[in-house]
Amino acid sequence: MLVVAFKPGHDGAVAAIDDRRLLYSLESEKDSRPRYSTLLPTTFLDIAERLGAIPDVVALGGWADLRPRGVVYTGAGYEGTQEPTVTTSRFFGKEVKFFTSTHERSHIYMALGMAPKDGAPLKSVLVWEGDVGAFYLVDSEHRIIRTIPVMTGPGARYSFLFGLADPTFPDTGGKPRLNDAGKLMALAAFGDSADASPDIRHVVERVLKQDSMYPAPKAEYRDSVLHNAGVESEECKIAAALLTERLFETFAEVARRELPEGTPLYISGGCGLNCDWNSQWAQLGHFSSVFVAPCTNDSGSALGTAIDALTTFTGDPHIDWNVYSGLEFVHDTRPDPARWESVPLDHAALSSALAAGRVVAWVQGRWEIGPRALGNRSLLAEAFSSASRDRLNTVKMREDYRPIAPVCRVEDLGKVFHEDFEDPHMLYFRRVREESGVRAVTHVDGSARCQTVTGTSNPELHRLLSVFAQGQGLGVLCNTSLNFNGDGFINRMSDLVRYCEWREIQDMVVGDTWYRRIAGS
């Protein structure tokens, strides 16, 4: 059975599953298009070019848009766990099954289908994102048997706090910005909730109790200590730490009270990208295990709708998937030989260049699904000098308070970090060993969000890390996404060359070819 699913609204995407195997999950923002792009015709054409047959099932995820005349719904709409709609339709002349289910269900089934099989009679699912904040109990037949609402819009509340302190965010008519949550997560590490004044605590509790964040009610907070205080102010950092703590406490309290102890927990929604919260869920002790997918936010919603359709028709959500299920790199031009020399990739020589402080644009195979660079569309740099962090933030045109993530081969985890668990998709925090000296990837609170690499999960990157370890003692590097500021991953040679020449990057590796900028060119 070939299922193709489409995700409307922001983070537009299309996913294809054939006989339970994920073929592609394509996000429209990737290939240097604006972050959070809606589904583009080019993305539809990309999937159509690569599929060998017309699908048996065409699935449309639900969505809702707030317009001046009211809410406009797409497909099954945004909220709810009601049964999907299945009809017969036609798709390019072929009779197909047409399927649509809510956006909320896409998150639930994305988590269920991507998680390892578990024979537990009950499973707990958490969806927390911009609009939905709830737990669900799922039975052994993969049916949702109970919904436990906790809080509407946890992600929107989290993002709103950043906008509240940001003088550039409007007092009226604004919506919580999709990219502010990650910035607030970075700022929270600079603050201590114990330092919160009564005024800050009052604001945070107001945010938690606010009826709605759409539109963002900033004008109602004009009298607060956080209104336009500046995102790097001490007040904002302390409030960020406190809100991070209070949001987790609110959901954890409900989990302990309402969910059976010992069930596996599957986390979905944009808040699943918060590594602090993921670590706390894993340490809570209430669940037998915790699973978070690399595309836990809306980048995985099309895939979730496809899995929901698969479950409806077969009774089983589980799929065979690989995180590198995007498109191959496009060789649409050749770097100018007057400016770039090309040589076969020499891992030892490249490791020496990295150790000397060079930043390397690193491209391998198909792009990663989800928002995080996992070693196929990455900027790499040595991790021992804090200058690497500053250089990478300058290259990426990011705020200097933003941390840089490490990538580490599994053989060196215990030497670099206090916790040596594997995390191939960079979803949990761990504590850095000070004696490891990896200053570029150590956040202000001593934590890091590390991608772990084995010889099978990403062989080419593991080989580079192993050669680097031979010379430097540890197989660890800085790893951040290869993209223009505000765009998705770079995925074609013309954009890669333009980016590297603009941002003064001297080294590009594409597959097994190393392009080196010629001095003075």
Swiss-Prot record:
Q: Does the keyword Transferase apply?
A: yes
What InterPro entries does UniProt report for this protein, alphabetically?
Answer: Carbam_trans_C, Carbam_trans_C_sf, Carbtransf_dom, NodU/CmcH_Carbamoyltrnsfr
The region annotated as signal peptide is none
**In its keyword annotation, does this UniProt entry include Transferase?**
yes
Q: Which UniProt keywords are given for this protein, alphabetically ordered?
A: Antibiotic biosynthesis, Transferase
Any single GO molecular-function term of the entry would be: transferase activity
Major enzyme class = transferase
The metabolic or biological pathway listed in the UniProt record of this protein is:
Antibiotic biosynthesis; cephamycin C biosynthesis
Instruction: Name the EC number(s).
Output: 2.1.3.-
Q: Which is a Pfam family this sequence falls into?
A: Carbam_trans_N
Q: Which domain of life is it from?
A: Bacteria
Protein purpose: Catalyzes the carbamoylation reaction in the cephamycin biosynthesis.
Q: Which family does it belong to?
A: Belongs to the NodU/CmcH family.
Protein name, per record: 3'-hydroxymethylcephem-O-carbamoyltransferase
State the organism named in the record: Streptomyces clavuligerus
Taxonomy of origin reads: Bacteria, Bacillati, Actinomycetota, Actinomycetes, Kitasatosporales
**Gene designation per UniProt:** cmcH
